[in-house]
Design a protein with these regions (language model features):
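Short, solvent-exposed loop/linker segments at beta-strand-coil boundaries, enriched for Pro/Gly
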Residues: 27-34
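Short acidic/proline- and small/hydrophobic-mixed sequence motifs that coincide with surface turns
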Residues: 16-21
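Asparagine-centered strand-capping/turn motif at beta-strand->loop junctions
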Residues: 11-15
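Structural beta-strand segments of beta-rich domains
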Residues: 3-7
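Short, surface-exposed patches at the edges or C-terminal ends of soluble domains, predominantly
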Residues: 57-61, 67-372
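Short proline/glycine- and polar residue-rich coil/turn motifs
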Residues: 40-46
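Short, hydrophobic beta-strand segments
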Residues: 50-58
Length: 372
């Protein structure tokens, strides 16, 4: 409520002559809320988007109808189209901020604008997602009590612009994030594998901070013992069985004691079959691990850390970009007796602070979240 939105009407002219959009009339329940008599030329064999700005003032479900009068070849035609809107009271919503100020993967980096499904799912639970386009937006959200969680996907090193100007977190941003978490805010960090750092421009420039190190700067600022590996998770066995790339993984080994897995369905007889089991999509992802008090990788998880998702028994770490990180030395963690596995998602709850969620891949992208 009381926030401007943009409704876009798309026209397509499949004829061999131009047309003129003479007017557009927007109405709700028979009441006109706006007209546009600008007059637009719709060229032959082309499309045209016409935006209309509207500010709803009440929380309700309603339908907006647009009526367009179009002239072509001395003939006038009238077309109508409707869209349903569910407007929520802005003051009663919980806010989640999504960082877009660091060429973040799936947000403003590679595969940009790919968190819409997550936003739709959140809206169903009266949660509003807000894209934070600048560092100033991110810092402001950290001190805004409306925001209960922040999501930071990996700052791209794949996008050409990101390779030219690789983004990292400023000291002010790190402090703001630490203060946000200390005040009870949830911080969600996602990594991406070093598949997407295996480029000459990166390998020849040691000054470029890798994605894992960049995200780990945040985890260090939060006081977390979790880290994202500078590696890639591969699985020769499961990828062959599924007929996909070695880094296109679907995991189904969960820690059922973690509240995030509540309600997840796993059929022990069909753990890899999506018809029976709800699988965790992990595309092009990295593993995660814990460090001890000295900052050294350890296979012993502190009591503050709770695993969420493990790799398969056949999943392994590989150092794709050959920078000496990742690979066989990456810590594994006990899933069951005589069954140690890579960890790909975990939470950490430090005393007096908000929850920290760490994943080796962006589990909230449109490719992972299926929602209407």
């Amino acid at each position: 409520t009381d926030e401007e939105l943009t409704l876009t009407t798309t026209f397509f002219n499949s004829e061999d002559s131009d047309a003129t959009i003479k007017s557009l009339t927007y109405s709700i329940g028979g009441t006109v809320i706006g007209t546009d008599k600008t007059g637009y030329t719709l060229a032959k064999s082309s499309t045209l988007d016409v935006p209309f700005k509207y500010t709803p003032t009440a929380a309700r479900v309603f339908t907006v109808q647009v009526t367009a009068v179009v002239e072509q070849g001395n003939n006038e035609y009238t077309f109508t189209k409707t869209i349903g809107l569910d407007v929520l009271n802005a003051d009663s919503l919980v806010y989640i901020g999504i960082d877009a100020s660091h060429y973040n993967e799936y947000v403003s980096g590679n595969y940009k604008d790919s968190t819409g499904n997550f936003g739709n799912l959140a809206a169903d639970h009266s949660v509003r997602t807000v894209q934070l386009n600048t560092g100033a937006d991110l810092i402001a959200a950290c001190s805004n009590p409306k925001y209960k969680a922040l999501i930071l996907t990996a700052p791209s090193r794949r996008l050409a612009d990101a390779q030219t100007n690789p983004k990292t977190y400023s000291d002010a941003e790190l402090k703001a994030l630490a203060d946000f978490n200390a005040a009870g805010g949830t911080v969600i960090l996602a990594g991406w594998s070093d598949n997407y750092e295996n480029y000459d421009v990166i390998q020849k420039n040691p000054a470029i901070k890798h994605m894992a190190e960049t995200q780990n700067d945040v985890l260090k600022a939060l006081g977390s013992s979790l880290r994202i590996s500078d590696d890639a998770t591969y699985d020769d066995v499961r990828s062959a069985a599924d007929g996909v790339d070695k880094w296109r993984l679907y995991f189904s080994t969960y820690n059922t004691d973690n509240f995030l897995t509540s309600g997840v369905i796993v059929d022990a007889d069909h753990p890899y079959d999506k018809l029976y089991t709800e699988r965790f999509s992990h595309y092009g992802g990295a593993s995660i691990y814990a460090v001890d008090a000295g900052g050294n990788p350890t296979s012993a998880l502190p009591s503050t850390v709770s695993p969420v998702v493990y790799g398969h028994a056949t999943t392994y770490s590989i150092d794709v970009d050959k920078d000496g990180k990742g690979g066989a030395g990456t810590p594994k963690y006990t899933y069951a007796a005589n069954d140690n596995r890579l960890l790909v998602m975990a939470t950490e709850q430090l005393e007096g602070k908000g929850l920290i969620v760490v994943s080796g891949a962006a589990f909230m992208s449109n490719f992972e979240v299926q929602a209407q």
